[in-house]
Amino acid sequence: MNIPREPRVGLALGGGAARGWAHVGVIRALEQAGIRPHLVCGTSIGALVGAAYAAGELEHFEQWLLELGITNVFSFLDVSMNGGLIKGDRLIEFFRSNFIDRPIKDLAMPYAAVATALHTGAEVWLREGSTVEAIRASIALPALFAPVLHEGRLLVDGGLVNPVPVSLARAMGADIVIAVDLSSDIIGRNLREEYALEVPSAEVSEWKRKLQAHISALFPTQQDDEPKLPSVLDVVTSSINIMQVRISRSRMAGEPPDVIIAPRLAHLGLLDFHRAKEAIEEGERAVEAALPSLIAYCKPSP
């Protein structure tokens, strides 16, 4: 007699920079509902959070996030003009020393990350080798982080080709795919900031001022008689938002997940890494909203 096999649940964590801290809340809420994925894959920030989960370090990682301030964020920015504004070595060495320092094959559950080959535009699935190096390649957002040389190829952020890696989760053996899309409501977010009622704190303003000053130093100063345009930083982040939304919609239309969890994160910017608590709470709320679909597809574990 053939005994039916339990369906394998895969978790596909999308990219979205600082909004990716919402993935922590999503995972916590899934487990509280008795839904435990059998495998996890991620793009960009999703690759980072997914690795922490696959390594069994999510609780430690979450505690660090909740203590993360703007000063800490700025300390990780090793500014460089060789391939990107940020070299990325400080950040990766921090994670190597404090969280994840083992091969992908030795993680507690199957894990993979998505990157993009810079010279060909090919989608690259990183399913073996160093976990930290896979993360570094997947988060290499063009112009912000320098590319990574991996096995003779320059790799950049996987969000350029597959922002929510449903296809990778299927290839890893998932029968049911839960996709977490961080970009459902973010188009135009940065360009709306000037009309927002909430005034940024002095600390936040100083953080954004420093980064904008560094970027602005690379470009000619706008003349007083020219029309006021968005800052370089706003244009870049808004362009990234548009790209991720359009690619995500296209990919998921052709490769639909079984359940989509879509946290509402328009109030968080790409670089708001110090606002982890808000992102995590929104991730939890998004799971609550999707519970009927989740329960229909995924039989909760006792």
What positions do the PLM features span?
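Patatin-like phospholipase
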Residues: M1-T43, A51-P302
